[in-house]
Regions:
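Histidine-dependent nucleotide/RNA phosphoesterase domain, centered on the 2H-phosphoesterase fold
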Residues: 1-154
């Protein structure tokens, strides 16, 4: 079974800003899968194959964590892996916000190590807002990215 641990985006104002970007991306002649605003999240850990028993252990750990609400400042937009072959369009966050999420990531990682459910993964805090399946000409996506390049909200 596949599973992941994430922090959900709950800020309605941020969701409205992302909807503006979604609108423009939706007008591009390309096969782009927009992430519904109700599903926007920061993935902390991804488990491509995990046993059901391990999921129960993880749930116990997560239920016992004492986390406070964090404020995130969004200040960038970009693509993975690059403009020649765009597969992900993401929203970035400022360094202070990244540090807060990284602290939560490390806390969870350390708890998972205690129960031997841990695999080191590269972690770069970002919010995936769209997946590009097929695009004949990336310049239109690039124009939308450039328009919102210096966004600051949150």
């Amino acid at each position: 079974m596949r599973a992941f641990i994430s922090l959900d985006l709950e800020n309605i104002g941020v969701k409205k800003e992302i909807e503006k970007i979604h609108y423009e991306l939706g007008r591009i002649k390309a096969k782009i899968k927009l992430v519904e605003t109700s599903n926007l999240h920061f993935t902390l850990k991804f488990f491509p194959h995990i046993e059901f028993e391990d999921i129960n252990k993880i749930i116990k750990i997560l239920d016992n964590l004492q986390l406070e609400e964090i404020k995130i400042k969004y200040n960038d937009i970009g693509v993975f892996p690059n403009y020649n072959k765009i597969s992900i369009i993401w929203i970035g966050i400022d360094q202070e916000s990244a540090n807060q999420i990284l602290n939560i990531y490390n806390l969870i990682n350390n708890k998972l190590k205690e129960i031997d459910i841990h695999k080191d993964q590269k972690f770069l805090p970002h919010l995936t807002i769209a997946r590009v399946k097929k695009c004949e000409d990336n310049k239109y996506i690039q124009k939308v990215i450039e328009k919102y390049k210096n966004i600051i909200f949150g």
